[in-house]
């Protein structure tokens, strides 16, 4: 089983990563990342702010990040992706409290999609950046990052699936990031968990809760190491429960009553 998640805009490069007795890994697609960096380096703060719809302060920060980005990744200029990303999904995942065995399992069974890096293993080193997959960054391959990455992410996902031993892909990414995957080119059974929260008597997807729940589902996978879709249905973290009637063969619906 392979799970995919989105990255996060919020990063933490100040807190040291947990000290495990194994080495971090190198991101595989940095030659492509360098091409994107070279394009992004050409923008002024005002141009970058306009492209990304971010504040002047954030634009200046990211102009500096692009300028400082290096092709060589090491412990001095980079941090393992699993511990660098912060945000709602990663709050639910709570990576800092994973055991060594769970992190090693994640290295095989979890991937993060990324606008700059394409696809990251949890222990892949990454440098601070902001480049969302939906950014309309004109590049030699087209008008946006979906055109830039083309089949590359899908091919590397297929390789990861082949290496981990079965054909179940659990899509816990946002639509923006999953748009960079070409499911028709994957030899996979793609499962999409959906998390609905009760609001005023009706169940609906509430972004903040859904993101956190995706992270909790990743945590569940790392802790229980399921090998079948049936085992995924046992997910009950955060008071969610599986709704058989609302679910389909590839869409698993989990619901939670309104919180008091």
Swiss-Prot record:
<comment type="similarity">
    <text>Belongs to the UPF0246 family.</text>
</comment>
<dbReference type="InterPro" id="IPR005583">
    <property type="entry name" value="YaaA"/>
</dbReference>
<dbReference type="GO" id="GO:0033194">
    <property type="term" value="P:response to hydroperoxide"/>
</dbReference>
<dbReference type="Pfam" id="PF03883">
    <property type="entry name" value="H2O2_YaaD"/>
</dbReference>
<protein>
    <recommendedName>
        <fullName>UPF0246 protein APJL_0596</fullName>
    </recommendedName>
</protein>
<dbReference type="GO" id="GO:0005829">
    <property type="term" value="C:cytosol"/>
</dbReference>
């Amino acid at each position: 089983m392979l799970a995919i998640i989105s990255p996060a805009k919020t990063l933490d490069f100040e807190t040291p990563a947990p000290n495990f007795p194994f080495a971090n890994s190198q991101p595989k697609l940095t030659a492509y990342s360098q091409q994107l960096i070279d394009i992004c380096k050409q923008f002024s703060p005002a141009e970058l702010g306009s492209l990304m719809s971010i504040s002047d302060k954030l634009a200046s920060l990211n102009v500096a990040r692009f300028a400082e980005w290096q092709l060589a990744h090491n412990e001095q200029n980079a941090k393992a992706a699993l511990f660098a990303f912060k945000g709602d999904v990663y709050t639910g995942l709570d990576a800092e409290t994973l055991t060594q065995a769970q992190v090693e399992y994640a290295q095989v069974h979890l991937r993060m999609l990324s606008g700059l890096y394409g696809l990251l293993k949890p222990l892949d080193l990454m440098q601070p950046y902001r480049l969302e997959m939906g950014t309309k960054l004109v590049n030699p391959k087209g008008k946006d990052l979906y055109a830039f990455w083309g089949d590359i992410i899908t091919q590397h996902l297929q390789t990861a699936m082949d290496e981990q031993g079965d054909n179940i892909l659990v899509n816990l990414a946002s639509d923006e990031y999953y748009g960079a995957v070409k499911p028709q080119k994957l030899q996979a059974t793609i499962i999409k968990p959906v998390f609905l929260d009760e609001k005023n008597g009706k169940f609906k997807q509430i972004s903040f809760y859904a993101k956190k729940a995706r992270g909790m589902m990743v945590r569940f996978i790392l802790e229980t190491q399921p090998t079948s879709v049936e085992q995924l249905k046992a997910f009950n973290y955060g008071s969610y429960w599986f709704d058989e009637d609302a679910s389909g063969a590839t869409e698993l619906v989990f619901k939670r009553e309104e919180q008091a």
